[in-house]
Amino acid sequence: SPVGANLGESTFESNLDRHPTSREGITCVVCHRINKAYNKVSGRLALVEGGLTAPVFGPEGNAGVKDVLDKPEQFRVVTEEKEPGRKIHNKAEVFAPIKSSTFCGSCHDVTLFNGFRLEEAFSEYRMSPAAAKGITCQDCHMGKIEGKPSGYAEGPAAVIGDVPTKTRKLTRHLFSGPDYPIVHPGIFPHNQKAAEFKTMREWLQFKHKEGWGTDKFEDAIPAGYKFPKPWQSVDDRYDAREILKEQFELLEFAKRARLEVLRNGYKLDDVVVDRADVGGLAFRVKVRNGTDGHNVPTGFTGERLVWLQVTVKDRDGNVVFLSGDRDANGD
């Protein structure tokens, strides 16, 4: 992650041994502690170091932060590290490039040290009809609808202690993509309660698919069943299950957004049957790019594989042809 790179962590270091902030991945600071336009640098950029109360950089400047700081009795925030209360950055400085597609290109165009072009989403965008029309990366990926230039919602930028800030333009920060999480749900999405409750190594030992922490499992534990040391306490297993319930809700929310961006990015025309007789069946379907912002698929060179799952059934519902099908794990 950019944080890990700034901390000097080795590329080959296990995530289990990285700094906790590095393991969080792409968080607020990766974009909002940048004060320089790097252009295409393959993500090799320097973050402005500082604690929680240090200034951040954004498109709007300090008006919103100042309004909160001017009402300490209402928002109960503090800007000193040692002062008790809700800590907040003491200033938001204007950084206009963060609104541009070039800012996204700092990371989303990757050339390896040997010159191999690993990812070129930004280069594709620069040559696209969307770029010619002035549509930015942010317009499609931070607007109302995932993957479409759909305008922006309005509302409070933050809710501090149940008190909303002033209404303003809202940019969506979910950044959905086609990625499918395969990490243990106790580890991802990042959850502060989960991180404080158990280490990553311990979470990897929690067999949530077997039902640990549910009444169905706990009331019928087989004789001689052995738990790893971190999970020998039934209370810990139930507490872990409560955390995972929150995680599964977040994963389901992310899934809906992921499918939204995929459905807007890929369009399937109607199936055209070229032949259907005793000699066989032949058909075709056109897959189209639903966006004019970049290629589909885009992303990393090694991941640019797309196939269709095709199932043909007879009149009785029996499967007579199957292609591109997945196993029980969805692979």
Regions found by a protein language model. Give the residues of each.
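Conserved, well-structured interaction surfaces
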Residues: 2-10
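Primarily the internal scaffold of c-type cytochrome electron-transfer domains
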Residues: 9-331
